[in-house]
Each structure stands twice: as structure tokens, then as C-alpha cells.
Amino acid sequence: MKPRMEYAPEFDNSYARQLSGFYTRLQPTPLKGARLLYHSKPLAQELGLDAHWFTEPKTAVWAGEALLPGMEPLAQVYSGHQFGMWAGQLGDGRGILLGEQRLNDGRYMDWHLKGAGLTPYSRMGDGRAVLRSVIREFLASEALHHLGIPTSRALTIVTSDHPIYREQTERGAMLLRVAESHIRFGHFEHFYYRQQPKQVQQLADYVIARHWPQWVGHQECYRLWFTDVVERTARLMAHWQTVGFAHGVMNTDNMSILGITMDYGPFGFLDDYVPGYICNHSDHQGRYAYDNQPAVALWNLHRLGHALSGLMSADQLQLALEAYEPALMVAYGEQMRAKLGFLERDSQDNDLLTGLLSLMIKEGRDYTRTFRLLSEVEVHSAQSPLRDDFIDRAAFDDWYRRYRSRLQQESIDDDQRQQSMKAANPKYILRNYLAQQAITQAEKDDIQPLQRLHQALQQPFTDQPEFDDLAALPPDWGKHLEISCSS
């Protein structure tokens, strides 16, 4: 019998090869007493990595202590607008792009190590990440992925004995983040504001060839590409609003050119339905409040369009940007109709949606729980599983009567509709208090709560009785937590 050949990831680092001057080469700086705490088995399988990659001595890769053949570590430079103000040069201040893995299906995946030490772009930072923020990003990116929302992924969490000084002393940690690209709106802004139009075009050509090859050579390739960026961003905002996700720090340097969620910091999911929910305690003006996210995304796209103004006419830019609102409204409308159990469109659908949301605001009802219970409605029953959640029974009964009447227009039976609604209304979301409980135990080297929460979040739409406690309403102290940007 022939010995089993060990699989080794293959790296083809086009960013390093084609974009000289867009980065600085450097090596990760290891942490003291680093050790692998946890990893995502489903993602590992997608990347072709079996269990032995997460045992000694292979774990040295996840801790920045060793490189795999073909890796070319570098820190990317970019700039951006932060809280609406031009912030100048930023860049990878604590992250290092290790390399671009070529998968068997032809896709490429960046391996990006967060918390890897000082870079030329660290500014006043120490280049490190703390265990708290690494666990939050791991859980959030995996949660959004399994909710069907485009996002970066997280493969490994490394903890250490390395002290990191924030508001208090915390454990240093590293996260191996995976995404098809880490290019941000801010990459284009950087070279635009440095008056380097050739570099803006070089970057645009690289991105198009890498991710939109069908438009290479087209006479309107830049407009077609930018239009798709606009529409992808619009659809991403629809996803966020539909599941009740607040990102918290939508600076242009945190906006992906591929329209994926990335750079998880002070994020939060809605508990009670509060449209103006602010999850970032540094956001004193509410710029990045939950209900303002679609408007901020469009503002950010205008900043990107400005940086691309040397590649397109003003009319082409405007035409692309005008695609945003229709794409947003179509995606949001489809997703919210699915949450309500409507397969067909009807003129009263919007009134029913706004009526339910208004009741939720008035009575402080939980966003996720309300829609999940709505999935259990039986169209021919006057009894609603939601009724006991509302104090103003008369107002709810009036809404529910109109809702049942609307459901009776649908062509599918209760069982089919309930299943389709459950597939649109998650039972399990990453509430901040659950993340905090997992963090508290992980800091004591107990990963059981982390493992359990991660497992539940991998099937957010499926009833899992063993995880019913993770679907419970949050305690009063756990509602609407505001999170610090410090990480």
C-alpha cells in the first residue's frame, strides 16, 4: 500500500506579484506562550485541511511562528473616511496577508493573520489583538456565513500568555481570517488622494481580472464593474437589515470591494426592535446606527465613486450609483416577504410589515423571537403564538386579522409555509451576551461554551432542542450592549 500523501495548501500570491508598491513585506511577530484554542472544522474542510493541521507542530502556522511553502507575508496599505471624515493613510495595522490559497474549485482565498504584530501602518497601535475581540470576530463571521450573508470567514483562534494592555490587561490572541479578497474601498481612496491615477487604474484592472474576468476588455468594463460593486453592497445592506445586524463601524476602510461583511468590531444583533440601535459606544452621533446603515453604505459608495472618477465619466458614475436604491429595495422586499411567509406580492404587504414593526417598537418586542414565532402561525386558527407577547391585544388582534387574511391568498398549505418561513427566520443569532459568556469562559481556558455556541450558530434556522437556552430572550443586563472599538 502506498503511503498517504499529505495535502499541502497551494499559494499563488497575485497581490504580491502584480501590485508592487501597494504593500510592505514583513514577517508575523509571534506571541509569548501561543497555543491553538479553537478552529472551525467546517471551514477547514472547505480549505482541504484535515485534523492533523490543528495539532502540533502544525499549529505554529496559526500562531505566526512558521510559514508554509509559497506564503509571501505582507501588510496592505490603504486609506479611508472614518465617521465621515477623511482619515488619511491607514493600512493593515495589526494584520498580515500570509498568502492566497488556490482551491480545487479554482477560487482563491486570502489567509490573513490578525494580531500578527507591528507593521508600518500600526500608527499608535501595538499591532496586537486581544482574545475577546478575536472570539467575537470568529463567532460573528461564522454566524453570518451560516445565515447566508456574504462575509469573511474565521478559521482559527490562537490564545497566549502574552499580556496586552487596553482598558485593562488582556490576553493576546491571533485570528486566521479567510476571504476571497481583502481589498477595500479605502485601497482606491489611498491612491486617488495621493494623486496616483495610474495606481488607481492598476488596482481596478487587477480586481476586475481577478473577480470579474467576464468584463476584461469590455469598452465599459469600469462602469459594469462599479455597478456590480454598488449592487452587491446594496444586497449586503438588505441582508444586514433583514436579520437585525448592526456592524458598528462602517468606515470606508472597512467596506469590501466584493460586497462582503468584514472587519468585525463593535457589532451587535438587535434584541428588542429598536431601529436607532447604536452598538458602538464611540458612535456618539449615531452615524452607524442600525437604521442608518443603508444610507451610510451609499455615502461610502459615493466616496469610492469619487476615487474612481478618473476611470469613468460623471454620467457613468451616476448611472452606476443609481442602481443602489432599486437593488436594495428589491432584495429587502424579497427577504422581508419571505420572513412574513408571502410568496406572491400584494399591495398590502408593506402596510402589514410596517404595522408589525410599529407594534414591536411600541412594546419593545424582540426582533428575532417575534419573526420566529410568526413562523408557527396556522392560517385557519384565530389563536396566535405571538398574542401573549403583546400588551395591547386589541392592536395586535387587528393586525393579526389582516395578516391571516393575507396568508389565505397564498397557494401553499400551512406546513409548506411554516417551513419556508423558518428558513427565513433564524432561531439562533449571536447575541452579545452569549458572546460575552463564551469569552469569559475561554479566558479561563474553558472552550465548551464557545464550542457549543459555534455549533448552534451553524444551523441557525433549525430547531435544536439541546440549544434552546441559546434561543432564549436575553436577560435585562444583556440587552442592547454597546461595545468598545478597542480590540
From Swiss-Prot:
EC number from the UniProt entry: 2.7.7.-, 2.7.7.108
Provenance organism: Yersinia pestis (strain Pestoides F)
Family to which this protein belongs: Belongs to the SELO family.
Catalytic residues, chain numbering: 253 (proton acceptor)
Cofactor field: Mg(2+); Mn(2+)
UniProt keywords, alphabetically: ATP-binding, Magnesium, Manganese, Metal-binding, Nucleotide-binding, Nucleotidyltransferase, Transferase
InterPro entries named among the record's database cross-references: SelO
Pfam families: SelO
Highest taxon of source: Bacteria
Binding site residues for ATP: 91, 93-94, 114, 126-127, 177, 184, 263
Role noted for this protein: Nucleotidyltransferase involved in the post-translational modification of proteins. It can catalyze the addition of adenosine monophosphate (AMP) or uridine monophosphate (UMP) to a protein, resulting in modifications known as AMPylation and UMPylation.
Top EC group: transferase
Protein name as catalogued: Protein nucleotidyltransferase YdiU
UniProt keyword ATP-binding present: yes
Binding site for Mg(2+): 254, 263
Any one GO molecular function term: magnesium ion binding
Magnesium as UniProt keyword: yes
Reaction(s) this enzyme catalyzes, per UniProt: L-seryl-[protein] + ATP = 3-O-(5'-adenylyl)-L-seryl-[protein] + diphosphate; L-threonyl-[protein] + ATP = 3-O-(5'-adenylyl)-L-threonyl-[protein] + diphosphate; L-tyrosyl-[protein] + ATP = O-(5'-adenylyl)-L-tyrosyl-[protein] + diphosphate; L-histidyl-[protein] + UTP = N(tele)-(5'-uridylyl)-L-histidyl-[protein] + diphosphate
